């Protein structure tokens, strides 16, 4: 990756910072612990977000609550890019052991040691 491409990517991220923070916060608020593995609520949110941004989504639910989302953008010609991720998180466990509630987003500024 050239320095120019890196700079353009970082500039794009900087220009979208508020939306990225809102998206991450919205995702954190949706419990998606596995087990039990019910992804219905978070999948509905993800599909809604992606469709708002022009993607066409298909939902596959091989088991109740176990959801896969396949989306496409634009015409199906030329090069393709596949992104693979997951929507579930490990169980939060004992909430008393958390510094902050696990499903309430907190933004902290952490300074590097001097």
Q: Predicted regions: what is each one?
A:
Residues 2-113:
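Acidic/His- and Gly-rich active-site-bordering loop/insert found
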């Amino acid at each position: 990756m050239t320095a120019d491409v890196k700079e353009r990517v970082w500039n794009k991220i900087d220009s979208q910072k508020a939306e990225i923070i809102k998206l991450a916060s919205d995702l954190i608020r949706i419990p998606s612990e596995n087990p039990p593995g019910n992804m219905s609520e978070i999948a509905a949110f993800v599909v809604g977000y992606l469709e708002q941004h022009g993607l066409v989504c298909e939902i596959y639910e091989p088991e109740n609550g176990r959801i896969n989302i396949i989306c496409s953008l634009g015409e199906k010609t030329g090069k393709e890019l596949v992104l693979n991720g997951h929507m579930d998180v490990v169980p939060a466990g004992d909430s008393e052991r958390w510094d902050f509630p696990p499903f309430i987003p907190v933004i902290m500024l952490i300074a590097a040691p001097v």
